């Protein structure tokens, strides 16, 4: 009885131990296979996604870069063309103006007008040249029409003269004698209470009459700065030249020293910044305006 019991227990123990060994080995193999499959699967998926993502990103960068460069190149090309075209237009215009000026100068040398030796019956009878002594370097053997565009400080006023047919014709007339008292560009911009010469004395209405009003206002402004037929109308008094502007207002001109002039239409004397003498008159540049709102 004891022997059979011992054998039974021994066999049972052996079976249990064998079963545990088998289960442990199977468990290890199962874990190893599962872990290997998981690692392999994870690595394959990540690698494919990474390659696909990287390739797509590189393609997008290349495509975007190409588009940007082409657009920039196109814009740069257009910009260069515009610069070249603008430069060509400017050069052609400058050449045309230069040729026109040269023609004007040659035409101005044909007939040099005589300067009156006497003034009016009023005041002293004196030579205009004795009263106005212009330095030789400021004397030009040409006409007002050709010298006006060369004075860069009065381009606005010169433009007004050019756009007035009657006055422009006089500046080109070698038999004319004129004095142009030209306001500088700065004075026209700063001394008219923020108005333009064509905006006063008559206000614009905003209708079809505006063209006429603009023309009349500019005419009024010009007539207040110009003396025509000067050599036949001036008088002298106390070393001053007195004459009437086209608008009828009296103006006085006096010289202080060899190159200093002043102009007055009332009690105030205005310094003359630049003086030029040509065959058919004088240009006096001032940093003020004689006609104000």
From Swiss-Prot:
Its main location: other. The keyword Repeat does not apply. It is found in: Vacuole. InterPro entries: FAS1_dom_sf, FAS1_domain, Mug57-like. The keyword Transmembrane does not apply. This is FAS1 domain-containing protein DEHA2G15708g. GO terms for cellular component: vacuole. Pfam families: Fasciclin.
